[in-house]
Amino acid sequence: MAAIRSYLWYVADGEISMQSIALGASKVTFIKGTQKVKETIKPDDLAALLAAPSDRSKIGIRDKTILILLYDLAIRVSELRELTLESLKLNETIPYIRVHGKGDKERIVSITDKTVEHLKRYIKIYHSETNGDYPLFYTVIKGNLSAMSTGNVERILNKYAEKIRPDHPGLPQKLYPHMLRRTRACGLYQNGVELELVSRIDRKSVV
C-alpha cells in the first residue's frame, strides 16, 4: 500500500488532476506498529524563540530571518543552505521561494508579506554587493565566502533557546532545525490541513 501511495503522489506532483486520487488513497488505513511521538515546540515557546533575536543588530536580523524561514517555509536545513538570491521571488503578486529538495527536486513555496519584509531587510544588509548565485546565508572565513554550515544554523537556534529558557522551561533540552519543520507540520494539521498533505512536508513526523 505504501508503494502505491508513493507512486500516486509521484504522478500527482506532475499532474494536478491526480491529486484527489492520491489524497483518497492516502486515507486508506493499515495497521502500524507503535511509534514514538517526536518532540515539537509549544506555541508560546515558539513565539518567544522567533522573537528572541534583536531587530537592532546586524547579527540579530540575520538570525531572525533564518529562524523565520526554517519555520514559515517548513524547510530542511539542507534546503536553507541551498537558497540563493535567485531562489527568491519577492516582488511577484504572490511572493514565493524556489526550494531545492531531496533528489534535486524543486518546489515552489509561497511566503507571507511579513516574511518578505524580513528577507528584504536582511538582503539590504548582507547582500548589497553580491550577485544572484551567492548563498542567501553565508559565512566568510579568510576571505572565502561559503554557505553557512548546518552546525552554525544549529548553534544559532540553540543560542536563542538558551536565551529564553529561564522563562520557557518547557523547551526541549536541545533543539534541531528539523524540530521547527515538524512543529510547522503539526500546526498545519491542527488547523485543518489534510493529514497526507501535511505529511508531505515531514514524512517522519508523528502527528
What is each stretch, according to the model?
Residues 1-207:
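Conserved catalytic core of the tyrosine transesterase superfamily
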